[in-house]
């Protein structure tokens, strides 16, 4: 966490980025990351919901359940994700926020699965860990709203 915070602080030195947490699973990560970024920054949240499955040959539709409270025009925006997988949700969020005239938009993710990408040009600038395609719970990650409270990430093996 300290390494990510230091890298972000170095890249945004002299600026005051807006960290935008994508709820709900990122909540613990964005809180820890915010404390690890030793420069002035703002913090705001969005919540998105995805329906359908692009992986099954269908179309995924994404809708915003909670929008930003802050004005991001001319601000550097750093989207904070729990995991970037296909990239469809992050792509939707990036494109939506870009319409509001920010100075820049980039992303940081705790877990990354680049081998599952369906979108190639995502601005994922900071990655905690590249992980295999397994189910993680705890540290804000859930399975049907359970296990978020666990203090660390754990692999969940379904039988």
Language model features: what each stretch is:
Residues 1-159:
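PRPP-associated nucleotide enzymes
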């Amino acid at each position: 966490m300290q390494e990510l915070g230091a890298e972000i602080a170095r890249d945004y030195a002299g600026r005051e980025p807006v960290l935008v947490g994508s709820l709900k699973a990122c909540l613990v990560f964005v809180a820890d990351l915010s404390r690890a970024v030793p420069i002035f920054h703002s913090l705001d949240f969005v919540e998105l919901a995805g329906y359908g499955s692009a992986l099954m040959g269908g179309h995924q539709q994404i809708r915003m359940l909670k929008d930003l409270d802050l004005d991001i025009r001319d601000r550097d925006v750093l989207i904070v994700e729990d995991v970037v997988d296909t990239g469809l949700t992050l792509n939707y969020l990036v494109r939506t926020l870009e319409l509001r005239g920010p100075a820049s938009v980039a992303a940081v993710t705790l877990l990354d699965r680049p081998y599952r990408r369906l979108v190639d040009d995502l601005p994922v600038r900071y990655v905690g860990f590249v992980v295999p395609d397994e189910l993680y719970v705890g540290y804000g990650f859930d399975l049907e709203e359970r296990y978020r409270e666990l203090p660390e990430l754990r692999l969940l093996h379904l039988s």
